[in-house]
UniProtKB/Swiss-Prot annotation:
Function of the protein: Catalyzes the attachment of alanine to tRNA(Ala) in a two-step reaction: alanine is first activated by ATP to form Ala-AMP and then transferred to the acceptor end of tRNA(Ala). Also edits incorrectly charged Ser-tRNA(Ala) and Gly-tRNA(Ala) via its editing domain.
Main location: cytoplasm
Organism field: Solibacter usitatus (strain Ellin6076)
Signal peptide limits: none
Xref: PANTHER family: ALANINE--TRNA LIGASE, CYTOPLASMIC (PTHR11777:SF9), ALANYL-TRNA SYNTHETASE (PTHR11777)
Reaction it catalyzes: tRNA(Ala) + L-alanine + ATP = L-alanyl-tRNA(Ala) + AMP + diphosphate
GO cellular component: cytosol
Family matches, as SMART domains: tRNA_SAD
Annotated GO biological process: alanyl-tRNA aminoacylation
UniProt cross-references to CDD domains, sorted A to Z: AlaRS_core (cd00673)
Protein name: Alanine--tRNA ligase
Family: Belongs to the class-II aminoacyl-tRNA synthetase family.
Compartment(s) of residence: Cytoplasm
Amino acid sequence: MTGHEIRQRFLDFFAERGHRVVRSSSLVPANDPTLLFTNAGMNQFKDVFLGQEKRDYVRAASSQKCVRAGGKHNDLENVGYTRRHHTFFEMLGNFSFGDYFKADAIAYAWDLITKDYGLPKEKLYVTVFREDDEAEELWQKVTGIPKSRIFRLDEKDNFWQMGETGPCGPCSEIHYDLGIEAAEPGREHEQFPDDAGGRFVEIWNLVFMQYDRDQSGKLNPLPRPSIDTGMGLERIAAILQGKITNYDTDLIYPIIEHAAEIFGVTPGADTRTDTVLRIVADHARATEFLIHDGVVPSNEGRGYVLRKIMRRALRNVRMIGIEDPFLYKLTGFVGELMKGPYPELLESIQRVARVTKDEEHRYATTFLVAERVFNDAIKSIQGNTIPGALSFKLYDTYGLALDEQEDMAREHGLAIDRESFDTEMEQQRERARASWKGAEKAAVTPAYQKLVEQGRTKFLGYSELEAASRVVGLIVDKESVQQVPAGAKAELVLDQTPFYAESGGQVGDHGILYSAAGEKVADVETAFPGVPGLTVHRIAALAPIAVGDTLRAEVAVPLRDATRRNHTATHLLHASLRTVLGKHVKQAGSIVDPGRLRFDFTHYAGLDHAELEEVERLMNQEILRNTAVQTDILPLEQAIATGAMALFGEKYGDQVRVVSVPGFSRELCGGTHVQRTGDIGVAKIVYEGSISAGVRRIEAITGEAALRQYQETSGAVKRVADMVKVSEPALIEHIEKMIANERALEKQVEQLKNKLAQAAVGSLDAEARTIKGVKVVAAHLDGMDRAQMRALADSLRNKWKSAVVVLASVEDGNVAIISAVTKDLTAKVHAGKLASSLAQAVGGKGGGRPDMAEAGGKDPSCLDEALTAVYADVESKL
C-alpha cells in the first residue's frame, strides 16, 4: 500500500464506523495561544475533551499534520541520525467524546491493523498501565492476544495527562516486531519491551481518558470517559511497505532521491551523505508545511523554530560541499508530492519557494563567519569536549545555535559540555533578570501597589469622555503625598476615569482636570497602567490638588477622536494585508497615537506599488461603506471560535473584548474605536519598509492628516506641472522624457571626458621627466573626477612600464589626488605615502596601497607648489 492509500484506508475505516472525518487543522494552533505548534491529533479537539466546546458529532477521525521541534516535544537534534525521528509527521487518530470506550477502541485498532492492513498477529505486542487490569483483560478477550505479549509499564510510559490537573488516564500502546534483522547493531539480544525503537516499533497509542485529576492530585472518574488515539503515518507506512526506516517509505524517499539528483550524489554511497539526505528530506517537509500555514523565518517564537529547522538543513548540506541554494526547489517538490491529501499546497508553492530562497541567501551571508570562528576555536581544544564557556561564546557572540554546534562537533568527534553551557546560559539569564527587575523596580513603585490594593480604577472611557472622579492618590518622586501645589509635576490616581491608559500599542489619553467649581486645576499629559488595574495620570498641576478632592476629568476629544480613527484603521490595515498578501500575515507590533498609526507585520518581502495601492484601496473601500463597528464581551474560547484574531503569546482573561467590522475584520482588542468606519474619513499609507528579517512596517495617517497629505501631494503635482508647462495627466510622461534626455547628456559628457583623458596621455607623455631611467609626472588636471584620473594613471603606468604618476584636480574648492607607482618601484616609492605627503600640503589627508593611492584636501592654493616638489621627492628615493 502507498502512504496515501494507508492514510485513506484509515479514514475510510473509521468513517464506516460512524466517525466524522475531520480535516487536519493548521500547524499554527487556532484555539491555543500557549501551544507553539500542533503536535498531536487531539490538539484541535482539546476544548471538546475539556467540555468547553460542543460539536455535532461524538466520534471523529483525522490525519493531522504535526511538528515537533520546540518546547517539550523536540525531536530536532535526532532527525536524520535515527530511523524514525521527524520534525514534521502525520498523526492518524480516532476520537470518542463520551461515546465508546476501551473495548471498542481496542477492537477498532485490532481490526484495522490485522484485517485491513494485514499485519500478522503473532508480531504484535501490547503495553498497558501497571494498574489497568481492565485493559489487560479486554486485550485478551477482544483480540485473543496471549497474556505473554501484554506488558504492564509504569506511569511514565503508559499514563497520559493534559496538564497538572484535568482530564487524564491510562493508555495502551501497540508495538510491532520487525524481526531480528531490524535490530540495531549490538542490540540483537534485546527483547520486548527493553528494545526501544530498534526491532520493536510502537505504532499506535490508545489513550483512555477516564479521570479528572484535581488540585490535590486525586483521580476522580469522569462522567463520560473519552478516547484519544494516535498512530504515526510514517511508521505504519514503513511496516506495511517492508522498510526498516521511515525515510525509505514512498512518503519521504522520493524527496531524498530528488535532493540527491540536485546535489549530484548517490543515496547509499556513504553514511554521512545519507544522513544529510535524511535531514534535508525531513526539513523540506517541515519547511513547506510551516510556511504554507503562515510561519515566516524570524528570530522569535514559531519563526525562530522554522529558521532553526531550515538552517540545520542548509548547514548540513554545506558539510558535503553543496553551497548553492537548494531548499526552495525541494519545498516545491514536497508540495507536488503531497497535493493529493493537501491540495491547498498548490496555492502557495511559489510563495513558499520565495520565502525559502530568501532565507537561504540570508543564511549564506551569516553562516560563513560563524563556521570559521567555530573551526578556529576547536583547534585549541584538548580532549574530546568543547568547554561550555567557549560554546556559549559561539552562541552568544556569533549566533551559532547550540544544536548547530552539536552537529558540527559530532562531525569532529567532539561533544559539548552541556552542563557548563547551561551554567553560562543561566548566568546570562540571571543578569538579564537582575537588569529587568532593577528597571521594573524603578518604574513600579510600592505606592502603586498600595493604591491598587485599596481599589482598582474603574475605566469609563469606552462610553464617557468626562466624569466626576475622586482623587485617591498623589505620587511625587515615587512617594505618596497628600497634596501637590500649583506648578508641580505629579502622578494622580482617580477612583474612576474616562482616560485610556496606554496599552496594546495605543497611547494614553490627554486632557484636563477641573475642580468642582469649574476651575482648571491640571493638564493630563498621559495616562498609563502603574500596575494591572490601576490607571495613573501624569499631570502638570495648575492649582493645588489634594487626596480626597472631587474633580471633573475631561478627555481631549479631538486627540481621542484622532487616536480611535487610527486604531480602527489599524484593524482595517491588518485585514487588508491578509487579503492582499496572504493569511501568513500576523501582527508583530503596533503604535497608535493621534498623529499616525504604525503597524509591524510578518511578511517575507517588501510590498510593490501595486500591492500597496490595493491595500490602501481595500481600507478606503471599507471606510466608504460606513460599516458599524461592533464590540462584544465574550468568553475567550467563544471569541476564538468565531474567528477573532489573537496574538500569540498574549495573555487573555476568561472574558475578552472583540472589536469587529462585520464581514471584514475581527480582533481581540481593548482599545478605543470609531462607531462607524466612515468616521475614519480617509486612510493614506505614507511608509513601508523592513525592520528585521521577515518583519515589515507600514505607517499610515487618517482623517484630517490624510486629507492634508492628499492636498499637499496634489498641490505639489500641480506646481511641478506648471513649472514644466504640461498638463497634470501628461506630467509623468514628460518627466520620463526629461530623465532620458538627462541620461543621454550625462553619457555624452562622460564620453567627452574620456576623450579628454586620452588626449591628456599625449600631453603628459611630453610633460613627464625621466629621473634615473624612470618616467615621473606630477600634473594639475582640472575638469577630471577621481575615476577618470585613476583610469588615466593606469594608462600611463601601462604605457611607461616603470613610472611614478601623480595627478590632481580641483572642483568646488576641493582637491582630489591620485598617485600610482609601477610594481617594480614600490619598494622605493610608496604611492600611499606619496599621496599622504601631498595631501598634507593642501590641508587634507589620505593614503593607500604601495602601487595606488588616493587623497584629498581643502586648500588648493598650495597645490601647484606641492606638485612641483614631487619630482625632487621621487628623485631622492630612487
